[in-house]
Amino acid sequence: HLDLPAFNHHRASDDAATVGYMLIPFWKMLHERGIHTLQAVNKEMEKLRPLGSKSNRFPKHIIILARNKVGLKNLYQLISASNLKYFKRVPTIPKSLLLEHREGIIVGSACEAGELFRAVLRGESEEKLMSIADMYDYLEIQPIGNNAFLMRNGTVDTEEGLRDLNRRIVALGDKMGKPVVATGDVHFLEPDDALFRSIIMHARGFDDAEQQAPLYFKTTDEMLEEFSYLGEEKAREVVITNPNMIADSCERMKAFLSEKGTYAPTFPGANDELRNMALKKAHEIYGDELPEVVQKRLDKELNSIIGNGYSSLYLMAQRLVHKSNSDGYLVGSRGSVGSSFVANMAGITEVNALQPHYVCPNCRHSDFDIDRTKYACGVDMPDKDCPVCGAKYKKLGSEIPFEVFLGFKGDKTPDIDLNFSGDYQPVAHKYVEVMFGEGHAFRAGTISGVKDKIAYGYVRSYCEANGINAGKDEMDRMVQGCTGVKKTTGQHPGGIVIVPKENDIMEFTPVQYPADRSEGDTITTHFDFHAMDDRLVKLDILGHDDPTVLRMLKDITGLDPQTIPLDDPETMKIFRTSEPLGVTLDELDCDVGSIAIPEFGTTFVRQMLKDTRPTTMEELLRISGLSHGTDVWLGNAQELVLSGTATLSQVICTRDDIMNYLILRGGDPSMSFKTMESVRKGRGLTPEMEEHMRSIDTPQWFIDSCKKIKYMFPRAHAAAYVMMAFRVAYYKVHMPLAFYSVYYTVRADAFDIAQAEGGAQKVLANINAIKKKGNDADKKEEDLLTILEVVFEMNKRGIELLPVDLYKSKASQFIIEDGKIRPPFSSV
């Protein structure tokens, strides 16, 4: 601002000289204000000080285009710095930083909020304007409608005055030899879309939201007409010639590195380490000479994993799980990683993906000669003794194809999702950074749009404020126009993006803090991870209650959850009746015992259990798949089961069912896989897929069911969740005091002692009071309702809730005391 000469900061002699240079223009400013004494300076400062506050230091807008890959990286570095180091209400870029990263980028002067336009508006001298414009590669002018607000606020008198501002910028460009470009400052596509922007801006508190500038995407003819006052030749130059020249100077490139496909992290010697690890474990379980089924599956998977460069990803997950287990916390697998037998042998998942089989824990003899049409889950097979040594066989296998995880050609990017204890999740996140080094592990960023319910609130508020009496169809149209508009940025609850050591995150994405915090340790990708999920590997390290619950139950009871038999008959019964609990729960309109069991405790799933009355682990697994999909059970499989068209074992429950079923009927494996992928993503069936299904006599109900599905769980995910849930259920049946105390402790935030004390009848009255509210019950009451149902069941089982005691209660932990449960202070 003062045109000071270059100098070395914080060097006394330079600082003193610079202050001297500053004084000269300051004296001039003082004289212009009629100030000639020190007292007058102090008095004037009272008026000037508010003008210099941070709230009045508005940054100027600029446009930055990446000309080439060097420029793209510089652009990402500027975006990152603006979000991490220079965020002041909005991301800002110091001019000095922009000049440091000038290579490969093109800088435009932007809209009315740009430095140049504002200087023109202030009537700065030509010399000053040339000094400002010197930094820009091209100068921008925009339709006068964009700046009509300057007439409304009295800054410019007429439309011709707005045109004169543009004329001055054009003349400046001509004099300096800089291209002038007509731009639209486009914020929406069609003119009518201005209404949606008005609604959004009204929701954000703008007083002039209804007075929208025509910031729609104009055609070339519209732009030529808009700038016709410059003359035909000049109008074509700013609308067509110069924009094309700038566009042509930019290389065609993608937003992130893509030459190699997926850029996966690597560990030295990972291929051999993973192979040796998997084979060692397989030999420990299945003997020195591996059964053909085991050897074939290992060879197939290892060749695909190693051949596609995913060994290091497996090792990374293995090390995380091993560390968590060593620290005393179980880890549950999510997603389709349980489809990999190698993952099971490496200790990443408990799910054994092989076909159902017996194996002897003593002599390692195995039996794979099982009727696979009768058993899909090894746990459901009858007990059997080893014919070699007489020891009781272990029953393993979940019948899950590997292709669900990596595809038939190993070309599907693997996504390893792991459920860590919520208490342990931060430790696991830090350990990833230790493994790969600082600057190579980032939280996966998310971009959230306006949800339809929020959009409805925006529209209703806008209509009320403007006296608009809109009908339902018009309201729906306005809601639809606002739904999905970017609202904020955030972070994936557990996703960690890994950048290989030989790469830089700036080759893929800028980085930033999540929108709800402007500092701290959490740095996320600037792009939504889904935009680049085929380029960088994401490891999902999620926090989950189940591992925490099982750790606490183990500490209280001394029973290791991994030793719990997954075929315990009494535990299996509670998924079809409350009889093993010794109570009936008719008052809750519930005749199963699965209340408070993960994945099976909600009213929705309890109704599914009532409809299906499962008796096997396989049926529980299928119910889990049905309950987590979208349009898989309701209006689909439920109707097929209740009408007798198909049984629970026949309907589509998990995505694997589609591929397995089609291949079993003689379908082409590759087409069967593509069909599964299309259906599970909610894309339905292509004519080619439907023709393939009919060629192998697929029943019409199966085809129709595929068309209805919007999303499906993988079988491996369901298997992992059901194993965890069954273990928790075992404690509920056989060790109820420990179960209830831990359940309440983990959900202490929702517990309200005033509502939960007083015995079964009082608790039931409180339950009914909340139910009577229906949809008017708030989230807190809905969470409390679940807690109260558990308390009611516990009371009926003869377990009392003691009062909070100043001397006996803990801070936040429910404790067992004389066959009863004492709440903590946090429950008050």
Where are these regions (language model features)?
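Short low-complexity, flexible loop/linker segments enriched in glycine and/or proline
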Residues: 23-25, 154-156, 193-201, 346-349, ...
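Short acidic/histidine-rich active-site segments
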Residues: 8, 12, 178-192, 333-334, ...
